[in-house]
Regions:
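Conserved small/polar residues in nucleotide/adenosyl-binding loops
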Residues: 257-264
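A charged, well-structured terminal subsegment
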Residues: 169-197
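Short Gly/Thr/Asp-enriched flexible loops that form oxyanion-binding sites at enzyme active sites
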Residues: 123-136
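N-terminal beta-strand-loop-alpha-helix module at the start
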Residues: 1-61
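Anionic-ligand binding region
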Residues: 153-173
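Short, acidic/small-residue loops that bind anionic groups at enzyme active sites
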Residues: 134-152
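A glycine-rich helix N-cap at a beta->alpha junction
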Residues: 69-95
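Accessory alpha-helical/coil subdomains and C-terminal extensions
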Residues: 198-238
Length: 265
């Protein structure tokens, strides 16, 4: 069984900045990590591989430094890693990104099952998984909270739909995006950490793919951030009481609250 996991290197949200001129995230000189829920997607693939056999391939699209999260995936147990990187891919929105990733997946070879985290912490669109499935012409289920693999080759997925849950049966190949509550990602082994630097890194560039260059990078991205502004939380109105008489200190806030209640009616 061939499993493939799409992961993303993201800026640590505590260090995140947006370029006000371009409306894009500043990724240089910022702390970067693997998107947290992508760890759950990777764990889902590794767990199934350990149970039924197969291989786990991990892919990411990004700048050369995104290699770091692929090495982290190797430390957890991934078998093969692919970095899709090219200046031509820069500035891609979800549509251009999913198109490029789908082309890279086709080049690698169609897996039986593709896992993605449901969304990234730097954009929260939850679009990449479904768009990859649509581009490849295969089924997808988003928001998986439980997965059961059937012997006949099908997949039973429980997905959250608001306050209710749906049970979906999938025929492979398919894409599944997962929720954090699906599992608890394993820790990297000492052997994995020591050996992650030795794993072969496969590089895929624009020249390696059979793609329409008008559909990649900024040119292929109809979605643009037009304005970025800080959100200032509303200030609460404060009342300071400076009365020596304890009874007056009690009467004042009661009267003030009574007055405000009438003003808001």
């Amino acid at each position: 069984m061939k499993f493939l996991v799409c992961i993303k290197q993201v800026v640590d949200t505590s260090k995140m900045e947006v370029d006000p001129e371009t409306g894009r995230l500043k990724r240089n000189n910022a702390n970067s990590i693997m998107n947290p829920v992508d760890l759950n997607a990777l764990e889902a693939a590794l767990s199934l591989r350990d149970r039924i056999g197969g291989t786990v391939t991990v892919i990411t699209m990004g700048p050369p430094q995104a290699e770091a999260v692929l090495r982290d995936a190797v430390a957890m147990g991934a078998d093969d890693i692919y970095l899709v990187t090219d200046r031509a891919f820069g500035g891609a929105d979800t549509l251009a990104t999913s198109y490029t990733l789908a082309a890279a997946i086709s080049k690698i070879g169609m897996p039986d099952l593709i896992f993605c985290g449901i969304e990234s912490i730097d954009s929260n669109t939850a679009q990449i998984g479904p768009e990859i499935a649509a581009t490849l012409g295969i089924a997808d289920v988003s928001g998986a909270s439980f997965i059961s693999f059937e012997k006949e080759g099908g997949l039973i997925v429980t997905r959250q739909n608001g306050s209710s849950a749906e049970v979906v049966e999938l025929k492979l190949p398919a894409v599944v995006t997962v929720l954090p509550e699906l599992n608890k990602p394993r820790y990297s082994s000492i052997k994995g950490i020591l050996g992650k630097g030795d794993a072969e890194l496969h590089i895929i560039t624009a020249a390696d793919l059979d793609i329409d260059t008008a559909r990649i990078g900024i040119k292929g991205s109809p979605t643009q951030v037009k304005r970025v502004r800080p959100v200032v939380p509303p200030q609460k109105e404060n009342l300071r009481i400076e009365e020596k008489d304890p009874q007056e200190s009690v009467d004042i806030p009661v009267s003030y609250t009574h007055l405000r209640a009438h003003e808001t009616k």
